[in-house]
């Protein structure tokens, strides 16, 4: 008798990584998944470590936990004296906790210190097919490598430290395909802002998104990280890009990446991490890359975004009363009038940095627009590299000199002006061209007005004193 062969259903990239990490699925409960890498920083970890101490527990796998100081650190000085009292307590507490529990720490004096989502990938801590968590909402950044990466809360941070596992419900799957190639002046930041503008800030809620298509495949790893970084801004649990030769070339030789024979074996396994032909997604979104222009936000959430050659939207044109009301509120806060060309919106602050856009490719892009020019009168512009490695490389290439000669401030690594949690913040009424990921009310300081843009658009705005279409002479 012939026994029929068992057919294996085609799987998405997310399903493959998910299935490989299930530890147990207790009846009536959420599955328990294994965590390969745990990244911690000074803001969301103190209570977690305290919980371990109270319970008398040790770390389940200290060698899989990596710590850095980034959110509250000063970008003006590496001295503890430059920190606010609360920030100093947090960084000193992290240092003590890492010492007590045997966790590798990249403190403010370490040459590789930086934003957790910048230094993790550049050190090779981030690897394809792994599950990565961090007490930070932009952990999705690491999904650019084909990892399943997402943010967790402080109680979950403690649970991972103690068990190296998490209870998680399986998410739905969404494919976002960007077909064709972008035109000159359009970057990864513009791609992801266009996506969010299309599906809204809650369009990805409940999903893990896989970004694909020719435009995504053409991106560098830096660009893919920018796209995945903002998956949370469309409401998604995580964002992923299938690993390919671009991924392998980026990772080879990095400190924590496999070496020798292990490298060859790892690459062979990573090459299987792609969505199978015939695998079904719960939702699919398609964009034509050629239709994407440089983007910038006009309102108070990342979904309120338009192309640079468009005017400020008019709420009166919106038929949905809830959306119309939100638009009216946003315009009132942001201080713009419907119908105003975005190229006529003046700015007085520029921030180039954050876990979205502070990598070497981002700084090179901004420097092209700053070279040989001067920051406009009345504009304060700062450039904050994402890590010590990025800073050193930029300085080796002379990018720091280009920025400084143009009138930009060249800073130390850190989260900086992305959030009003350190000494880099906006004053009420300031209008900022920012390469960060959130433009919520008060995000960069009480009463501040934030417009999300690419590094090239931010640098150009600093020079012109207002937003410009970088595809044209200015």
Curated annotation (Swiss-Prot):
It comes from the Bacteria. Pathway: Amino-acid biosynthesis; L-leucine biosynthesis; L-leucine from 3-methyl-2-oxobutanoate: step 2/4. Its cofactor is [4Fe-4S] cluster. It catalyses: (2R,3S)-3-isopropylmalate = (2S)-2-isopropylmalate. Keywords: 4Fe-4S, Amino-acid biosynthesis, Branched-chain amino acid biosynthesis, Iron, Iron-sulfur, Leucine biosynthesis, Lyase, Metal-binding. It is an enzyme of class 4 (lyase). [4Fe-4S] cluster binds at residues 355, 415, 418. Belongs to the aconitase/IPM isomerase family. LeuC type 1 subfamily. NCBIfam families: leuC (TIGR00170), PRK05478.1 (NF004016), PRK12466.1 (NF009116). Heterodimer of LeuC and LeuD. This is 3-isopropylmalate dehydratase large subunit. It comes from Shewanella oneidensis (strain ATCC 700550 / JCM 31522 / CIP 106686 / LMG 19005 / NCIMB 14063 / MR-1).
């Amino acid at each position: 008798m012939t026994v029929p062969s068992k057919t294996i259903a085609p799987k998405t990239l997310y399903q493959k990584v998910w299935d490989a990490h299930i530890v147990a699925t207790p009846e009536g409960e959420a599955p328990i998944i294994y965590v390969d890498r745990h990244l911690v920083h000074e803001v969301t970890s103190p209570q977690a470590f305290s919980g371990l101490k109270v319970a008398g527990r040790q770390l389940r796998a200290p060698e899989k936990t990596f710590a850095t100081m980034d959110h509250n650190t000063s970008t003006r000085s590496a001295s503890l004296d430059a920190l606010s009292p609360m920030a100093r307590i947090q960084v000193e507490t992290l240092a003590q906790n890492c010492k007590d529990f045997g966790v590798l720490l990249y403190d403010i004096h370490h040459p590789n210190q930086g934003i957790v989502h910048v230094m993790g990938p550049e050190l090779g801590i981030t690897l394809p097919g792994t599950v990565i968590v961090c007490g930070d909402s932009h952990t999705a950044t690491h999904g650019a490598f084909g990892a399943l990466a997402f943010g967790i809360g402080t109680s979950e941070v403690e649970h991972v430290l103690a068990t190296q596992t998490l209870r998680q419900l399986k998410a739905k799957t969404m494919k976002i395909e960007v077909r064709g190639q972008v035109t000159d002046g359009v970057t990864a930041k513009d791609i992801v802002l266009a996506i969010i503008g299309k599906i809204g800030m809650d369009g990805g809620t409940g999903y893990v998104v896989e970004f694909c298509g020719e435009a995504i495949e053409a991106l560098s790893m830096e660009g893919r990280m920018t796209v995945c970084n903002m998956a949370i801004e469309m409401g998604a649990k995580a964002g992923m890009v299938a690993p390919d030769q671009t991924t392998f070339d980026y990772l080879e030789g990095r400190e924590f990446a496999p070496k020798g024979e292990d490298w060859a074996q790892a690459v062979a396994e990573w090459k299987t991490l792609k969505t199978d032909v015939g695998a079904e997604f719960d939702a699919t979104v398609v964009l034509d890359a050629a239709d994407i222009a440089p983007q910038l936000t006009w309102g108070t959430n990342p979904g309120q975004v338009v192309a640079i050659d468009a005017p400020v939207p008019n709420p009166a044109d919106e038929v949905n009363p809830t959306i119309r009301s939100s638009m009216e509120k946003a315009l009132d806060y942001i201080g713009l009038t419907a119908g105003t060309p975005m190229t006529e919106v003046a700015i007085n602050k520029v921030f180039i940095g954050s876990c979205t856009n502070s990598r070497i490719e981002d700084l090179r892009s901004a420097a092209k627009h700053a070279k040989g020019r001067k920051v406009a009168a009345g504009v304060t512009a700062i450039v904050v590299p994402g890590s010590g490695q990025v800073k050193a490389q930029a300085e080796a290439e002379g990018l720091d000199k280009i920025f400084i000669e143009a009138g930009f401030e060249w800073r130390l690594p850190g989260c900086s002006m992305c959030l009003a949690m350190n000494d880099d913040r906006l004053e009420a009424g300031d209008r900022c061209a920012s390469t960060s990921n959130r433009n919520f009310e008060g995000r960069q300081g009480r009463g501040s007005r934030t417009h999300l843009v690419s590094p090239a658009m931010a640098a150009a705005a600093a020079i012109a004193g207002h937003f410009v279409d970088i595809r044209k002479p200015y």
